[in-house]
Amino acid sequence: MKLRIFDNEGERFYSPFNLAIFALLKRHRLSENAFFELVQGLSPYTDFFNINRYVEEYKEGDIFSDIFIEIPEELRNYKRVTEAVFSNHFKNRKSKDGVDVYWDFYNLLHDYLDNPSSVTIDKLLTCFENNKDKLNKAFGFGQNIFSQRTGERPSPEEFANQYQEMFEADLNTYLYQKFSLSKIFDQIREYSDTTKRIFKATGIISFDNGFVEIAYRELCTCIFEEAVIQSRVAGNIYEELRPEYDSYSEYEESVNSFYCDVTNLSQVLEYHDEKIKQVEDNIQKEFLGVSIEKIPTIIADKRRREFAEFINKHYPSEKVKEILELFNDRSNDRHIKEAVSPDATVPTIYEYMVGLAWYYFSGKRVDILNSYNLTLSANFEPLVHAGGGLGDIVIYEDDKVLMLEATLMNANSQKRGEWEPVLRHSINLKVEEETKNTRREVTSFFIADSFDANTINIWKAVAAVPLQSSLEKDKFTDNVVIMPINTDELSSLIDKESEYDEIISKVHKLFEVDKVNFDIDWREKFMEGIV
C-alpha cells in the first residue's frame, strides 16, 4: 500500500497497489490482461481526473488507444526512408538481426505499395512467414499481422481490401505507431509475471483461470473503503498533510523514511480510532449475529474448506504421488514447477507436496493449511519456503504434535545443513509442549529423498540423551523422536490412512526402547576428577 512511483521531480506519484485494490473493489473481477494493463499502464504523468469512470469502463486493450505517439520528423512522409534513418527509429536492443528483419519487411511493404501484384504479395508474405515471431512481436502486439495460413496467397484485390487500413495510411507513420505501441504492449506482458508474483505474495489478490479477484472479499470491502483507496491512487506529495513526511526524500529515500519504516495498515490508510471503530462495525454487520471475536474463526474455517476443495480438485492423491516421484531426479525441476507453481522454488514445492501427502496419509483430518510455515498465495499456491526459525510443517492434533522437516539436500549436504536446525526445532517444540503441560506426544519426521547412514543412526541415538532448548537455556528434555522417511516411503503412506495413528504410535515405541537414565553432568564430573 505504501509503494509509489514518482515523477522525475519527486512530486507527483502513482500507487499501483492502491489502483489494483480500487479496480477490484469496483469491478469485482477482471481478466488478467486487463488487470495488468490497468496497473502497469498508468504512471505519475497520467491524468487521473476521471479514474473512477476509466476503471469502470476499462476493456482489455484500451490502454493503447489512449497513448499518444509522437512521430519523428524524419518519418513524416510517404516516401521510403534510408536504412540509416530506419535503424535509428526501429531499434531492437536485444538483437541486431531483428532490425535487419524489420528493414527487409519494411522494404517489401514499400515494394508492394509501388507495385501491387501477386509477385510482391508473395515476397512480402514469404518474409512474414519466415520471421513471423519477430515481426508479430515488433508490429502486431504479438498477434498475426497477416492472417493468411502459411502458403496461402490472396489476389491483389483481396489483399488490398483486407489490409486497407495499413496501405491507405501513411505507411511510415502507421508502422512507427504500431512499433511503439507493440513495444509498450511487450513491456507490459514481460513485466506481468513479476507483477503477478508480487500481488500473489500479498495473499489478498487471487489469480484463477485467467481472472483476478480480491480474496476474502466480504472482509476486504469492510476494511478498504472505495473512496479512501481511490484518493490514494495518485496525487502530489506536497499536497498531502502527513506528519510522517512532507517530501519525496522523507517518504522513501533513506532507511528511516516512511516507506522503509514498519507501519501497520491503519497508519498507512490514516485510520484513526473513530474510523477503526467504523471498520469494526462494518465487519460486524457483514457477519450478522456473530461476535467480533468469532469472526477470525469463521473466516479461517471458510478458508480451510476452500483449501480442501482446491486440493481435491487440483491434487488428488494419485497426482501427489506422481509429483513426489519427480523429485527423485533433479533434472525434473522444470516439470515440477510447471505442474505446481512457476513462482516457487523446487525446495519450496517439495515442502508443499510433503504436506499434501501427509494430509492424505491422515485421512484428510489434519489442518494442513494452518500447519504450513511456508507462504501461500490467495490461490493456495506455494510461494516462499518456511523461515529458518521454524519447522517446515507443524501439525497440532488433540493428542499429538507432529513436525515435518523436508529437504532436498543430498545425503552428504544433510550433515552440514540439516542436522542442527532439525534437532533444534525438534527440541524446542518438545520443550514448549512440556512447559505448557499439554500432554501431547511430540514426533518429528525428517523427510528427504535419500539419507546418509550416520544421519539415520544419529537421529535414533539422540532419543536416549537429554537435550537443551535453544530458546530457554535452563530447560532440558529427553526422548526427542526424529524419524527419517524418504520420499518413496512417504508416497506409500498415502494409502495407509487407516493405520495413521497406529504407525505414529509405533514410531514412538521404536524410539522409547532405547531410552536410558543419563547423567547430564557426566562431563563436568569427569573433568573435576582429573584436573
Residue map of PLM features:
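Catalytic core segments in nucleotide and nucleic-acid processing enzymes
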Residues: E250, Y259, L265, E270-V531
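Donor-sugar nucleotide-binding helix/loop cap in glycosyltransferases
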Residues: M1-N256, H272-I292
